[in-house]
Amino acid sequence: MAISKEKKNEIIAQYARHEGDTGSVEVQVAVLTWEINHLNDHIKQHKKDHATYRGLMKKIGHRRNLLAYLRRTDVNRYRELIQSLGLRR
Protein backbone atom coordinates (compact mmCIF):
# COMPACT_ATOMS: atom_id res chain seq x y z
CA MET A 1 0.00 0.00 0.00
CA ALA A 2 1.30 3.43 -0.89
CA ILE A 3 1.63 6.25 1.59
CA SER A 4 -1.63 8.13 2.14
CA LYS A 5 -1.82 11.81 1.30
CA GLU A 6 -2.57 12.70 4.94
CA LYS A 7 0.42 10.74 6.27
CA LYS A 8 2.72 12.25 3.64
CA ASN A 9 1.54 15.78 4.49
CA GLU A 10 2.13 15.05 8.18
CA ILE A 11 5.71 13.93 7.47
CA ILE A 12 6.32 16.93 5.21
CA ALA A 13 5.04 19.33 7.89
CA GLN A 14 7.36 17.78 10.47
CA TYR A 15 10.56 17.86 8.39
CA ALA A 16 10.03 20.87 6.08
CA ARG A 17 12.66 23.60 6.31
CA HIS A 18 10.13 26.32 5.39
CA GLU A 19 6.47 26.53 4.48
CA GLY A 20 5.74 24.88 1.15
CA ASP A 21 8.94 22.83 1.27
CA THR A 22 8.31 19.40 -0.24
CA GLY A 23 11.61 18.68 -1.97
CA SER A 24 14.37 19.29 0.54
CA VAL A 25 16.66 16.38 1.33
CA GLU A 26 15.23 16.09 4.85
CA VAL A 27 11.67 15.71 3.57
CA GLN A 28 12.67 13.22 0.89
CA VAL A 29 14.62 11.09 3.37
CA ALA A 30 11.79 11.18 5.92
CA VAL A 31 9.21 10.04 3.36
CA LEU A 32 11.54 7.32 2.07
CA THR A 33 12.18 6.14 5.63
CA TRP A 34 8.46 5.77 6.26
CA GLU A 35 8.05 3.84 2.99
CA ILE A 36 11.06 1.62 3.78
CA ASN A 37 9.73 0.79 7.24
CA HIS A 38 6.32 -0.01 5.76
CA LEU A 39 7.83 -2.26 3.06
CA ASN A 40 10.00 -3.99 5.67
CA ASP A 41 6.87 -5.00 7.57
CA HIS A 42 5.33 -6.29 4.33
CA ILE A 43 8.45 -8.32 3.45
CA LYS A 44 8.47 -9.94 6.90
CA GLN A 45 4.96 -11.29 6.26
CA HIS A 46 5.43 -12.12 2.55
CA LYS A 47 8.91 -13.58 2.27
CA LYS A 48 8.50 -14.67 -1.37
CA ASP A 49 7.44 -11.26 -2.68
CA HIS A 50 10.62 -10.62 -4.64
CA ALA A 51 9.27 -7.70 -6.67
CA THR A 52 8.54 -5.75 -3.50
CA TYR A 53 11.95 -6.69 -2.13
CA ARG A 54 13.58 -5.22 -5.23
CA GLY A 55 11.58 -2.00 -4.80
CA LEU A 56 12.67 -1.88 -1.16
CA MET A 57 16.32 -2.16 -2.18
CA LYS A 58 15.88 0.68 -4.70
CA LYS A 59 14.36 2.92 -2.02
CA ILE A 60 17.16 2.07 0.41
CA GLY A 61 19.74 2.97 -2.25
CA HIS A 62 17.99 6.25 -3.02
CA ARG A 63 17.89 7.15 0.68
CA ARG A 64 21.56 6.23 1.05
CA ASN A 65 22.49 8.55 -1.83
CA LEU A 66 20.44 11.43 -0.39
CA LEU A 67 22.03 10.96 3.04
CA ALA A 68 25.52 10.90 1.50
CA TYR A 69 24.75 14.16 -0.32
CA LEU A 70 23.47 15.77 2.88
CA ARG A 71 26.53 14.62 4.83
CA ARG A 72 28.81 16.14 2.16
CA THR A 73 26.99 19.47 2.08
CA ASP A 74 25.88 20.06 5.70
CA VAL A 75 27.05 17.72 8.46
CA ASN A 76 24.94 19.38 11.18
CA ARG A 77 21.68 18.93 9.25
CA TYR A 78 22.72 15.34 8.52
CA ARG A 79 23.29 14.57 12.22
CA GLU A 80 19.99 16.18 13.24
CA LEU A 81 18.09 14.19 10.61
CA ILE A 82 19.72 10.89 11.59
CA GLN A 83 18.91 11.59 15.24
CA SER A 84 15.27 12.49 14.60
CA LEU A 85 14.62 9.50 12.30
CA GLY A 86 16.38 7.03 14.57
CA LEU A 87 18.79 5.81 11.90
CA ARG A 88 22.35 4.64 12.58
CA ARG A 89 21.76 3.22 16.02
From Swiss-Prot:
GO terms for biological process: translation. One of its GO terms (molecular function) is structural constituent of ribosome. It comes from the Bacteria. The keyword Cell inner membrane does not apply. InterPro entries: Ribosomal_uS15, Ribosomal_uS15_bac-type, uS15_NS1_RNA-bd_sf. Pfam families: Ribosomal_S15. Keywords: Ribonucleoprotein, Ribosomal protein, RNA-binding, rRNA-binding. One of its GO terms (cellular component) is cytosolic small ribosomal subunit. One of the primary rRNA binding proteins, it binds directly to 16S rRNA where it helps nucleate assembly of the platform of the 30S subunit by binding and bridging several RNA helices of the 16S rRNA. Forms an intersubunit bridge (bridge B4) with the 23S rRNA of the 50S subunit in the ribosome. Belongs to the universal ribosomal protein uS15 family. Part of the 30S ribosomal subunit. Forms a bridge to the 50S subunit in the 70S ribosome, contacting the 23S rRNA. This is Small ribosomal subunit protein uS15. It comes from Streptococcus agalactiae serotype V (strain ATCC BAA-611 / 2603 V/R).
